[in-house]
Swiss-Prot record:
This is Valine--tRNA ligase. The gene is valS. A motif ('HIGH' region) lies at residues 52-62. Belongs to the class-I aminoacyl-tRNA synthetase family. ValS type 1 subfamily. ValRS has two distinct active sites: one for aminoacylation and one for editing. The misactivated threonine is translocated from the active site to the editing site. One of its GO terms (molecular function) is aminoacyl-tRNA deacylase activity. Monomer. It comes from Oceanobacillus iheyensis (strain DSM 14371 / CIP 107618 / JCM 11309 / KCTC 3954 / HTE831). It is found in: Cytoplasm.
Amino acid sequence: MEQDKENKQSLPSKYNPKEVEEGRYQFWLDGKFFEATGDPDKEPYSIVIPPPNVTGRLHLGHAWDTSMQDTITRMKRMQGYDVLWLPGMDHAGIATQAKVEARLKESGTNRYELGREKFLEKAWEWKEEYAAFIRSQWEKLGLGLDYSRERFTLDEGLSDAVREVFVKLYEKGLIYRGEYIINWDPSTKTALSDIEVIYEEIQGKFYHMRYPIKGSDETIEIATTRPETMLGDTAVAVHPKDERYQHLIGKTVILPIVGREIEIVADDYVDMELGSGAVKITPAHDPNDFEIGNRHQLERILVMNEDGSMNENAGKYQGLDRFECRKQIVKDLKEQGVMFNIEERTHQVGHSERSGAVVEPYLSTQWFVKMDPLAKSALDMQADADEKVNFVPDRFERTYFNWMDNIRDWCISRQLWWGHRIPAWYHKETKEIYVGKEAPADIENWEQDEDVLDTWFSSALWPFSTMGWPNEDSADLKRYFPTNVLVTGYDIIFFWVSRMIFQSKEFMNEKPFEDTLLHGLIRDADGRKMSKSLGNGVDPMDVIEKYGADSLRYFLMTGSTPGQDLRFHWEKVESTWNFANKVWNASRFSIMNMEGFTYEDIDLTGELSLPDRWILARLNETIEQVTRNSNKYEFGEAGRHLYNFIWDEFCDWYIEMAKLSLYGEDENKKKTTRSVLAHVLDQTMRMLHPFMPFITEEIWQQLPHEGPSITVSKWPEVNSEFDNPQAVQEMQRLVSIIRSVRNSRAEVDTPMSKQIKMLIKTENEQLTAELEKNRDYLERFCNPSELSISTVIEAPDKAMTSVVTGAEIFLPLEGLIDFDKEIKRLENELAKWTKEVERVQKKLSNQGFVSKAPESVVEEEKRKEKDYLDKQAKVKTRLSELK
């Protein structure tokens, strides 16, 4: 269709991201361009967004993650797919509850005073508030999400899926209730998942003790970082092949302070080389000890309460806080002569991500998923080339295998109110357990389990629960599952990716996604992880405010390769803004020269100049490179090809050369150049659109175009008619000649405005004819007073000389410079660089310097040596040309 000329406006003279991006997102939403259509004539392509937590605003990592997904889905939509990018958010159990409780505390109340129902109302209010924040940030980033299908992990549909999965796994014996060692937060009094435990290196102590052997003068030496747990010791373990302790296996130790008799057991878990080779076993307070205790049927003695205070099993220490108990017990053991050494030691200690409290390995009755059968099924699927998930980069598949091969049962219950309440009820009299999707009919005789499920339980179902499962007749489930790619960070392979895979295998009998594209972490410019404590975090909205979403997105998309971390540099974002500004100015010039030009006017069948043929051929190559690399998720490479084509070729060379036709008198040439400009700019904006959606839509709307939005325009395809290796070769030679002349002029400080004689000696007549045909460009960009092109040119005396493929270029210097003065200046410069070369080489030949100086200092001196040698060589060449 013809472009509406009445609505057409030229681009403003200055690129202002705020003005460009303002209102554009609403235009896309109004056009419903992001909504999946279910068109049976199109192949479906789907992605589910990793649901951000409704705990606060999105950080830079979210911006990176979602920019990748948006780039992929925009490209696929343009390639003709029926694209579903499904948005949603995660209720984030403990994280959100902690935030809501903190807000309640500020208002002078707490969840217990409110009660469960009122507290959940407050939590839902929080969710609505922060969901609105998140949506506004998605809008600022320009994300093409299908909001008609937005999901939340506590939606009724997803809650139904959670209950269905829980009940089915329970009925298969894969969910059970039992005692196990869990990560316990004494501050919030809840179990934590492994990902909610942050390990920090602290300066602690290693306490060495001697336990007496019953009926003997012998003792056995053990060591611990948590002496308060000795009150719950029920054995000492040694390796069965450790000759030092063979005679003690089966004997009894008297536990100091407590006086309890505990056995010395033999277990392969013990490392003979570590410490004394004997370890205290506390099955209720250590996961490894728990396993050893199971193997040897040891008693489990819990010595702490849920709040971290010591309980009745701690004897005289009952009521003390665990750390106060540690101090007191150390004092008592020293007095008894049991503790003989305290060693300062740096070690890793787990802290709650939410409360900061030191996490306690704690014996608790919880709900668990039995993992071995589920892991085996998932691993069997991964071993099948046709059924497996493709990890990108593939090295992360090994990480996945390592985790699944060594997996432990999954503790899924949490002592919280915000979340999916466990669908289990206990009979008030018989204590019978009932598990079902619906409450028992005689509900008055039952009490529902107070706990909720681990957040990861519901997010593990995300790829299929969001599409209507357990309704297997759901149209979306049939069409869009399994999804095509999951984009997420490599740091949650264990906690999310693996769980989605085994739950999908269990309930859908297939993988949840074809590929999983794993990116790294965003770090600051010095490579440090961004954190509140370091104060080095960057709010993506601040970056957008300063440079616009397009600049931030392009930096994020091109700044790293799959699986690698990304360092954030404000300077690099500024450089992408410069790129956007370059695109804007080039487009503005082009559009200004297309007044009255319509989509139907584009005609590429006329006589094409060398720059026309070259830019069309290079466009072909760029389309191929950008498409191929993007399909492999190599967005950095795709962006590099696009950047080089736009900046170095289209802007710096083609547009400048196009001015000869645009400002000329030949109307046919003018129309052809306009057509090439319009076509190349249109195709380039389409390729750039997934990376920089706002600016490309703005420019595309001003170009002669067809269709309502670049978002739903067709992705560029290679046109074999424009393949032209000869034109590319000819243009490369022409550009090389122009560059060499400009460089030579700069070396003798001769501005382009001053005309100079120029001689080009070619190696054959064919090349002479080629250059003669392009004489206009040589004269326009080299500004010669006289231009001779021939195979028989003699090299003049005292001339600047440069060589390109098939030709030599001479610029006679007679009349341009004072030779004697220039020779003297160059000799002084040569002496200067020679002196610098000698100085740096003397330094590098000093073995004392090379061996003792930091590597970075030595490398800097080597860099200087190379730089000085290059400058010395150039000055020598120029002197030889003048003498």
